[in-house]
Amino acid sequence: MSHQFSFEKLEVWYLAKEFSKRIYAVTKKFPIEERFGLTAQLTRAAISVASTIAEGSARASKKDQAHFSQLAYGSLMEIACQLIISCELGYLNNTVYQEVRDKMEKISNKLNALRNYQLRAFSSQAKRTP
């Protein structure tokens, strides 16, 4: 296998990437008039989660990495809000909504765990620095 970037080794990145593909599939069924509304918002935010995890992995300090993990979490919460609205507008049925929500919960838990690890590692580095 060819070289893997550090973000490609993160399970949370893989889950976020797969999640973004699922969001694309789900939003294809939205009304055409939502193409520049909810559809665009959801797909951009979904891509942002995986992309921000990748970008954060390239940061030199654990503090910066944790900041990007927090930004990715923020994008995930944006998606949560938009999915609730989509469901209430009748664009998603409850089964699809719950399936996507379950995936988000798993990503959310892993993102929080990653961020906590990064912050602990930063704290350890700061304590060792004279």
Question: Can you name each region flagged by the protein language model?
Answer:
Residues 1-55, 59-130:
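Short, C-terminally biased terminal segments at protein or domain edges
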